[in-house]
Amino acid sequence: MPIGKLTLATLGCLLLWTATVAAGAAQKEDALKVGKKGEITLSQQAKVGNVVLQPGTYVVQHRVSRGDHFVRFLELKEVKYSTTEINDTYTEQDNAGEIKCRVEPATGRIQQTTVYTVTDGGAVRITKVAIKGENVVHVF
């Protein structure tokens, strides 16, 4: 094969390889990052975003998707069932809602999961959540 054709073939292969690498790099994979979680108990009905949470125990969990931050509220329900002479119970999680939030830096690592609320016209509204072990506060 003459040098000119060999050079042209080499350049063609190099161009094809470059296009393949560039196409692979352009396909960005979105990672769903799930942060720490904590458990809270609400003694009265509370609103967060446009979701109303009933009194009860919830697992709160932070997650990040495509750069947006969310807090998920999973209600813990005790379910009783009796298939034998012994009445057994187990805890079931029910997704009560997931609310978009923004994060603000905390003064340090959060020592205890805490929910901050305000009362608007007699209704309780959750304004922010701090989850044990994290170093940010989730603001609604």
Can you name each region flagged by the protein language model?
Residues 20-25:
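Sec/Tat signal peptide C-region and signal peptidase I cleavage site
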Residues 10-19:
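Bacterial N-terminal signal peptides
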Residues 56-61:
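A short tyrosine-centered beta-strand micro-motif
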Residues 85-140:
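Beta-strand-rich cores of mature extracytoplasmic or soluble domains
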